Structure formats: C-alpha cells, structure tokens
C-alpha cells in the first residue's frame, strides 16, 4: 500500500481552521476542485459514519465516509467508498497543530 504525506501552514488561527475542517461537508467552500457537496441521509456533518457525496470541477463524483473525528486532538479521518476517479482503498487522516510563532495552523 502506498502512503502519501502532505503538510502546509495556514495563515489562520487553529480554532478557525478546525471549525471549518470538522464540518465534513465544508470542503466545497475551501477546496478549489470541489463544486458541490452534500451529506447523505440527512445526518449531521460531524457525525462519525456520515457519508459525503461530492462532485469535482472535472465532472467526477466521490463518496467518502467520516470514520473518526476528535475535537481534543483536532483530527479527522475519512475513507473513499465510491469514486469515478481511479482511487481504491483510500484512507486519509488530517491533523491540525498550532504554529508556535504566530496565529497560524500546521495542517498535516
């Protein structure tokens, strides 16, 4: 299994970044490739087990399930259930940490 790690520093306080990230249906507001998104079955977007269904700018669709969410650790983990892009057995974990030299956030 391949493993990819990405990280960046966001010029915003961790509380504000986490508020957006913990909403599993918010990525159409900040991810440039996502056009529209909705949570299936009317579940809350921070409910572990909820499924988001979204469309990309190129017309592809992806369904992902939230499998873990920790406010104390500021960690979110999700997996792809179905996709029209060639991704299989995809699991992602995002963790936020405060940057100590300012009001910024480390996304890992």
PLM features: residue spans?
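Glycine-rich portal/gate segments that line the openings of hydrophobic small-molecule binding cavities
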Residues: 26-29, 38-86
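A generic beta-sheet turn/junction motif
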Residues: 10, 57, 100-102
């Amino acid at each position: 299994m391949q493993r990819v790690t990405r990280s960046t520093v966001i010029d915003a306080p961790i509380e504000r970044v986490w508020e957006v990230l913990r909403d599993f249906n918010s990525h159409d507001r900040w991810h440039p490739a996502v056009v529209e998104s909705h949570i299936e079955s009317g579940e809350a977007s921070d409910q572990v087990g909820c499924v988001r269904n979204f469309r990309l700018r190129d017309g592809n669709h992806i369904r992902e399930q939230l499998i873990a969410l920790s406010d104390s650790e500021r960690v979110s983990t999700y997996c792809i259930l179905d996709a029209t892009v060639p991704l299989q057995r995809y699991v992602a974990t995002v963790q936020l940490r405060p940057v100590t030299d300012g009001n910024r956030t480390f996304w890992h």
